[in-house]
Regions:
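Mid/C-terminal beta-alpha module of Rossmann-like enzyme folds, strongest
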Residues: 105-108, 112-164
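Amphipathic terminal alpha-helices
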Residues: 179-180
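NAD(P)-cofactor binding segment of oxidoreductase domains
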Residues: 1-9
Length: 180
């Protein structure tokens, strides 16, 4: 085969949200590339299967790039959440990335000076910014002059903090938009 390397764009949804979240920032909920996959959504399950299928093919080297929630100039989740009521997981940390960083990271992998360091790897790609969903979306609604979202404060919160330390170390990547 003439294909030597495959860069597969995946999602942090492959980790799932099965851990209850303690507001005291319990370190056991920090997710790295070594964390076992536990997808809960259909799309998360399909992405995990695709990752495994590509990684098991010895005809080429596959690098998996798992992006968090995407934010861009015309794309922001507050536009969907503004004015909604009973939103779950208010204390869960956000795990998002700006589209400028997505492009920077992809280019960083494709143009890396030492290809052996970046192929056959898995990288999480999430901005190092993890306020609670309630704090973040409330502030963004105010910033965009939108109706405040209302959160369900009665139920147990589930969530995770996804770390991109490996990406920053191996690629030497510095986030263009570290604060979203």
């Amino acid at each position: 085969s003439s294909i030597k390397n495959v860069l597969f764009i995946s999602s942090t949804s492959v980790y799932g949200d099965s851990s209850s979240f303690d507001c005291a920032q319990d370190d056991t909920l920090s997710v790295t590339e070594e964390t076992e996959l536990n997808p809960e959504t259909e799309s998360g399950k399909q992405l995990a299967q695709a990752e495994q299928l590509l990684q098991s093919n010895s005809n080429f080297k596959t690098t998996i790039l798992r992006f968090g929630g995407l934010i861009g100039e015309d794309r922001h989740p507050i536009k969907f959440l503004a004015g909604r009521k009973n939103i779950e997981n208010p204390d869960a940390p956000i795990n998002m990335i700006n589209q400028e960083d997505c492009m920077g990271i992809i280019l960083g992998i494709l143009c890396h000076s030492k290809p052996t360091e970046v192929w056959n790897q898995t990288f999480n790609a999430v901005a190092p910014f993890h306020p609670s969903r309630r704090e973040y979306y409330t502030n963004k609604a105010i910033e965009f002059n939108l109706t405040l979202p209302e959160f369900n404060l009665e139920c147990l919160t589930f969530g995770k903090t996804i770390l991109s330390t490996k990406l920053e170390t191996v690629l030497g990547y510095s986030f263009i938009k570290p604060i979203l």
